[in-house]
Curated annotation (Swiss-Prot):
Subunit structure: Probable peripherally associated component of the endosomal sorting required for transport complex III (ESCRT-III).
Keyword Cell membrane: no
Name the record gives this protein: Charged multivesicular body protein 1
Topology class, membrane: Peripheral membrane protein
Organism for this UniProt entry: Dictyostelium discoideum (Social amoeba)
Subcellular location: Endosome membrane
Coiled coil: 7-35, 102-125
Length: 192
């Protein structure tokens, strides 16, 4: 199973590299698109635009597949850990049976202590695995933070994404809130 885990992780890394190559190719196609537009070559521009879109989609597909393979690798890694814990617990149970037959109370106590430690380790690993699985299968970043970051990046580059995002805050609302707060502050200052 360790070999399969290695192969999964290796494949995921390869797909991530392919995704980056496709991103670079997309950027190159966009540069060619810009040059074609500047030269008035609209047929060429259309071809470069199609190529850029295809490369972008290919990059996203590679990234999605890499993410899915990472999730599978995480599950395989969990199975390997559980197999190890299960093997340890099986050995402890055998030791318990042997001690019970001999009725050696000291050995029974030692085996029970060891069993309890293994069981606690299993609980800790189960919680860790459950958290890791939740992180790989759900989106943990709140949507409002994602929208805010998109808006910030768009503003930095002078891009307009207000129409594309329904939840992006408008500057008028932010300005209104600022004006209201300023007025309240001024009134409080005047009272004192």
């Amino acid at each position: 199973m360790e070999n399969q885990l290695f192969q999964l992780k290796f494949t995921s890394k390869q797909l991530e590299k392919q995704s980056k190559k496709s991103e670079q190719s997309e950027k190159a196609q966009k540069i060619k698109l810009k040059k074609a537009i500047e030269q008035g070559n609209m047929d060429g521009a259309r071809i470069y635009a199609q190529n850029a879109i295809r490369e972008k989609n290919q990059s996203l597909n590679y990234l999605r597949l890499a993410s899915r393979i990472d999730a599978v690798a995480s599950r395989v890694e969990t199975a390997i850990r559980m197999k190890s814990v299960t093997g340890s617990m099986a050995n402890i149970v055998k030791s318990m049976e042997k001690s019970m037959r001999n009725m050696d109370l000291e050995k029974i106590t030692q085996v029970m202590d060891q069993f309890e430690r293994q069981f606690e380790d299993l609980d800790v690993q189960s919680v860790y695995v459950e958290n890791a699985m939740n992180q790989t299968t759900t989106l943990s970043t709140p949507a409002d933070q994602v929208d805010l970051l998109i808006s910030q990046v768009a503003d930095e580059h002078g891009l307009n994404v207000g129409m594309q995002m329904g939840s992006a805050p408008s500057e008028k609302v932010q300005q209104g809130e600022t004006d209201e707060l300023t007025e309240r502050l001024n009134r409080l200052k005047q009272k004192n």
